[in-house]
Amino acid sequence: HVQVLSDILTALGLDPDAETPGRKVVRYLGTSLVKTMELASRCADPQAAQIVAAECVTLAETKVHLNWELIGELAKKATAEESALLTPAYEQVEREEDEHLYHTAGWTRELWIQALGMPAVLPPPEETRKVDTAIEAAEAKKSRTASAKVTTNTKAKKASAR
């Protein structure tokens, strides 16, 4: 998706490599998320480090998701020439970015649920279903309750059989 944005910027006559205040902030945030994951990997048990990593990825995906929503809004208000560049890129990438966000959020939720000692659904329903929209994500999240009960009952039966 970086290449898609670079191509758009170039076509608009902008330098995709220009150092801007926004670019500096994004770099700082990204570096901070990576350092956070590295710290958790060194200092925490594997389960906690995995949750930290999932949260960091979810934070990053949330920002990327917002950026593509903004590109979509810009495409609606742009000149015809700008819109001709922005709209196809938005349509190509935005749905994939939705999927990334919903899947990472599902993993983060289930890892936390597991860490709190409750029945988790791993992989999460967002991962096992084709979840591309907020409605589909809500339906997948809602379905996890039934899946968690099945998982709990199966584990209980296996434990009592021992």
Question: Where does each model-flagged region fall?
Answer:
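Short terminal or interdomain "cap/linker" segment that borders an active site or interface and mediates
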Residues: E91-D132
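Conserved alpha-helical segments that form or flank metal/cofactor-binding pockets of metalloenzymes
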Residues: H1-L33
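Acidic/histidine-rich alpha-helical segments that form the ligand environment
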Residues: K24-E81, P88
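Generic L/I/V-rich hydrophobic alpha-helical segments across diverse proteins
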Residues: L5, W68, L86-Y90, E97, ...
